[in-house]
Amino acid sequence: MDLVAWLICIIAAIGFAFDIYELLMLPLILRPALTELIGSPPGTPKGDFWFGMLFYVPAFAGGIFGLLGGYLTDRLGRRRVLTWSILLYACSAFLAGFSTNIYMLLFFRSTTFIGVCVEFVAAVAWLAELFPNPAQREKALGYTQAFSSIGGLLVAVANGIAIDYAQHFPAISIPEFLQPILGGAIAPEHAHEPWRYTLMSGLIPALPLLVIRPFLPESPVWAERRKAG
């Protein structure tokens, strides 16, 4: 493979790994997040209601937009949709760490799932068109998707680091001018909550993407079809 093919495979592998990273994040942070935001952990009627909502609503939103992912990749291009979907779920995870209420957390978890589902469709389409040879295509898809299993390990490690070192991290706060828009401030006693840092670590996949993105070409198959009308 040439350098461009390697770069595309690297981005796809990072995307697949952090798909699982973002999805498995919720079970790790749910109990402390619910306890802080609504005062009711899972196991109480109110806690169980929001427990279900935080799984059901994002999954539903991701499923709907995942179905639209094929249309978006055909309409806008594989590279553009892949890039923006990764940025969407990475930034959504980061912003979820600033949640001041349960509705804000639900919204950003939903946009995280939307980004994950659309990214998966775009990445598979891009890889399939990058390797016209069936044997190479199968290997590329298999090896890059295998990185999904690493996502679960990474998020467990990130959550462990957040729990152990949260008090040493910068305090999480919301600028005063944004507090009326976002529904209030983060109380000082909650400014070092590990669950917030775990969510914010979801920004990580955006960093290599911003470096590599200028060197990534559009799918030649899609470009030819687009040119042909």
What are these regions (language model features)?
Residues M1-G229:
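Transmembrane-helix signature of 12-pass secondary carriers
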